[in-house]
Amino acid sequence: KPGHRVMPDLVGRKFTANEPNRVYVGEVTYLPCKGGKNMYLATVIDTYSRKLAGYALADHMRVSLVVDALAHAHGVRGSLDGAVFHSDHGSVYTSQAFRSYCSSLGVRQSMGAVGTSADNALAESFNATLKREVLRDRKVFDNPIACRQEVFRWCMRYNTRRRHSWCNLVAPDDFEALTSATLTKAA
């Protein structure tokens, strides 16, 4: 498409970072509701702690959805200057508007190869976990409002209370607090 550009892969399936706020991954996933409607969730996940630093949920998959998710992460982190944001080749991520927004924040874009979920495995895994834990045995949300409420509740719990194997079985927020204290002492 005119104005769309694929960016190089700066992550190379290494979904780690030495400190918070350096490397993020994200993706858009659909959340099915009764009546055939979908909601769409865009995520921004820190590879250091697996913290969901930003997200946006809407009934559309326009560029504003991923811009809102990155804006949320910017608000949570205070700055994203110098960070890498890794995604797939979705048109919302290759768009001029998203590229410009990343540039305005000092974020470098990174993209995996086409057609391989392994190149964004961390974001894919997050979405699978969210759907499994929120929907449980259901196939769809009752309605968009219920979807928003349940996803919001789960996202808040994910960062503050859900233990994560990557984080030595503590929640992402606790992991960052513990490791930032260690990093400060080491400096």
Annotated model-derived regions:
Residues 1-187:
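Charged DNA-binding/catalytic regions of mobile-element recombinases
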